């Protein structure tokens, strides 16, 4: 179709609509100067333009329709929609265009160079309040960000009052299993509700396992965890009355027994101490003498007593021992080192355990009790010797006559009196 049919004459709509009091945006002659910024500002403010002479060249130009309502600060029609008045601006050049003799009145239309398109400005007042809510989301301030700095917390946007997320939470509204309060803080996809728990919501199974899956050692060290949030998950943990130990912060993170106030550097040492000394649980028993131990390593070391092999020899006196710990204690005799004195009588001992056993003489304490007859002893060695009376076990035998004895001192006396050996 020739371009001449696309250009509208001034008779088509020049007398149907009044002149625009504002600046004319559709002047199509390049020699006509564009209105200045000051003029457009004054006209937009409501000032009337000067009347034009009908015989002036400007009156012969094609006049655009009234665009007073389409000022740069308003948009009453459709939002950013192309108007029908600019149809010839939008239409691309056709391959079968008219010849040069049929060019339009405006030479700028025939040029291939780009030119500014008269878009209508975007108007916020033309939209309803519900249409603007999805464009601008209100984020509520999160107080937990100050408390949990560095924990990766973030705030979720608060949904609309009628949105399903406001009633069921963002996850259930989307089809998920979890639900969260609108505008609440979360730490990932699986944040839980409640103070303190949200800060540890979804930081991996390792961090959550420290609080939800207490082990046997954790149950011994922290008996109060059996009551509270995870009481149902700590059914296998002993009751607090049987644990007799807790952790006490002593500078370097030491562990203190609440029964005897003994301090340990590791939780494992405290656990072994409670099992051996206070709980009465000694599950490892010797097959030869029946002595029980609280740890498997202690039982293996004890089995060396029943063997005749003495592989640890003293280089000073030549005396041999079955265990290296016994040799270390023996070496203190040659050095005459007794660093552990008794607080009652001042007697000094090579080992701390010997000093502790000695103090029972002054205090009268007898912590070792026989399970058969109920007799109590101040030292564990005396209880072991006493228990052989009930079992009939005689570990010390004479190599000359084969007679057995329950105590080593009885064997030595037998050798001196019956065989004349010293």
From Swiss-Prot:
Transcription repressor essential for hematopoiesis. Functions in a cell-context and development-specific manner. Binds to 5'-TAAATCAC[AT]GCA-3' in the promoter region of a large number of genes. Component of several complexes, including the EHMT2-GFI1-HDAC1, AJUBA-GFI1-HDAC1 and RCOR-GFI-KDM1A-HDAC complexes, that suppress, via histone deacetylase (HDAC) recruitment, a number of genes implicated in multilineage blood cell development. Regulates neutrophil differentiation, promotes proliferation of lymphoid cells, and is required for granulocyte development. Gene3D superfamilies: Classic Zinc Finger (3.30.160.60). Residues 140-257 are annotated as: Required for interaction with RELA. Residues 1-20 are annotated as: SNAG domain. Keywords: Disease variant, DNA-binding, Metal-binding, Nucleus, Phosphoprotein, Repeat, Transcription, Transcription regulation, Ubl conjugation, Zinc, Zinc-finger. The gene is GFI1. Ubiquitinated. Ubiquitination and degradation by the proteasome is inhibited by the ubiquitin ligase, ARIH2. Residues 1-109 are annotated as: Disordered. GO terms for cellular component: nuclear body; nuclear matrix; nucleus; transcription repressor complex. GO terms for molecular function: DNA-binding transcription factor activity; DNA-binding transcription repressor activity, RNA polymerase II-specific; enzyme-substrate adaptor activity; RNA polymerase II cis-regulatory region sequence-specific DNA binding; sequence-specific double-stranded DNA binding; transcription cis-regulatory region binding; zinc ion binding. It is linked to Neutropenia, severe congenital 2, autosomal dominant: A disorder of hematopoiesis characterized by maturation arrest of granulopoiesis at the level of promyelocytes with peripheral blood absolute neutrophil counts below 0.5 x 10(9)/l and early onset of severe bacterial infections. InterPro entries: Znf_C2H2_sf, Znf_C2H2_type. This is Zinc finger protein Gfi-1.
């Amino acid at each position: 179709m020739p371009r001449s049919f696309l250009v509208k004459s001034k008779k088509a709509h020049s007398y149907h609509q009044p002149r625009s009091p504002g600046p004319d945006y559709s002047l199509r002659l390049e020699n006509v100067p564009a209105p200045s910024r000051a003029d457009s500002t004054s006209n937009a403010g409501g000032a009337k333009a000067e009347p034009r002479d009908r015989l002036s060249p400007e009156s012969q130009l094609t006049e655009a329709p009234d665009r007073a309502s389409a000022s740069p600060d308003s948009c009453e029609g459709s939002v950013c929609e192309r108007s029908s008045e600019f149809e010839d601006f939008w239409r691309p050049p056709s391959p079968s265009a008219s010849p040069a003799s049929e060019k339009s009145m405006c030479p700028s239309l025939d040029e291939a160079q780009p030119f500014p398109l008269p878009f209508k400005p975007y108007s916020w007042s033309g939209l309803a309040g519900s249409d603007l809510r999805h464009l601008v989301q209100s984020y509520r301030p999160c107080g937990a960000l100050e408390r949990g700095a560095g924990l990766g917390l973030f705030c979720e946007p608060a949904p609309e009052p009628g949105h399903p997320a406001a009633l069921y939470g963002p996850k259930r509204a989307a089809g998920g299993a979890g639900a969260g309060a609108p505008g609440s803080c979360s730490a990932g996809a699986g944040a839980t509700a409640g103070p303190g728990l949200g800060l540890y919501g979804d930081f991996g199974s390792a961090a959550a396992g420290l609080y939800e899956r207490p082990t046997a050692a954790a149950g011994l060290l922290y008996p109060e965890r059996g009551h509270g949030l995870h009481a149902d998950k700590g059914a296998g943990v002993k009751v607090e009355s049987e644990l007799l130990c807790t952790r006490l912060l002593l500078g370097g993170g030491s562990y203190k027994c609440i029964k005897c106030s003994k301090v340990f550097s590791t939780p494992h040492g405290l656990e072994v101490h409670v099992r051996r000394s206070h709980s009465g649980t000694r599950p490892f028993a010797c097959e030869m003498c029946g002595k029980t131990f609280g740890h498997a390593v202690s039982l293996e070391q004890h089995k060396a007593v029943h063997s005749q092999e003495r592989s640890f020899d003293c280089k000073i006196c030549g005396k041999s021992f079955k265990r290296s710990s016994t040799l270390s204690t023996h070496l203190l005799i040659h050095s005459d080192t007794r660093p552990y004195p008794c607080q009652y009588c001042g007697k000094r001992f090579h080992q701390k355990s010997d000093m502790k056993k000695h103090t029972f003489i002054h205090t009268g304490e007898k912590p070792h009790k026989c399970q058969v007859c109920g007799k109590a002893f101040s030292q564990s060695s005396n209880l072991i010797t006493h228990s052989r009376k009930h079992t009939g076990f005689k570990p010390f035998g004479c190599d000359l006559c084969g007679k057995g004895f329950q105590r080593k001192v009885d064997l030595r006396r037998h050798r001196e009196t019956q065989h004349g050996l010293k």
